[in-house]
Design a protein with these regions (language model features):
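Basic, Lys/Arg-enriched alpha-helical interface segments
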Residues: 1-70, 112
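Compositionally biased, intrinsically disordered low-complexity regions enriched in proline and serine
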Residues: 9, 25-27, 72, 80, ...
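Basic/aromatic recognition patch in beta-strand/loop cores that engages polyanionic ligands
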Residues: 58-88
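Enriched for short, Lys/Arg-rich terminal
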Residues: 76-80, 84-112
Length: 112
C-alpha cells in the first residue's frame, strides 16, 4: 500500500481572486454564462490540483531572467497560474491569459 500523499493548503491572494472574477466576467460577456461557469470550474480544478502536486509546472521564464526562481507556474491554456510554495501552503498570486504582457504583469503584481 502506498503512503498517503500530504496535501498543501492552497490560498489565493486578493489579486488572484480578482483575476478569476475578471476572467469569468469577460467570458460571460463574450461567450455566455454557461461557458464562463465551465471555465471557472476548470480553473478551480487546476487551482485545487496544486494541493496534491504543488511543485508541478516550471519557473516563469520572465522571472528566471531576473534571477528570481522561487515562483512556479502551472499552465492551463491560455491561462497561467503563478504561485509560490511556502511551508505547507501554495499561494497563488496571478491567474492571467498568458498571451498578455507577462513581464509587466509579473513586475506589477510580484515585484511592485
Amino acid at each position: 500500500m502506498v503512503g498517503r500523499q500530504k496535501r498543501y493548503e492552497v490560498l489565493l491572494t486578493q489579486g488572484a481572486e480578482r483575476d478569476l472574477e475578471s476572467i469569468y466576467d469577460y467570458i460571460a460577456e463574450v461567450d455566455g454564462k454557461a461557458n464562463a461557469n465551465d471555465m471557472l470550474d476548470r480553473l478551480m480544478e487546476a487551482v485545487e490540483g496544486l494541493a496534491r502536486f504543488p511543485e508541478r509546472g516550471s519557473c516563469p521564464k520572465e522571472l528566471v531572467a531576473l534571477g528570481i526562481k522561487e515562483y512556479r507556474q502551472t499552465q492551463f491554456k491560455p491561462y497561467r497560474l503563478i504561485c509560490r510554495l511556502m511551508a505547507r501552503q501554495v499561494v497563488i498570486y496571478l491567474i492571467v491569459d498568458g498571451r498578455r504582457d507577462m513581464q509587466s504583469l509579473l513586475a506589477n503584481r510580484l515585484l511592485g
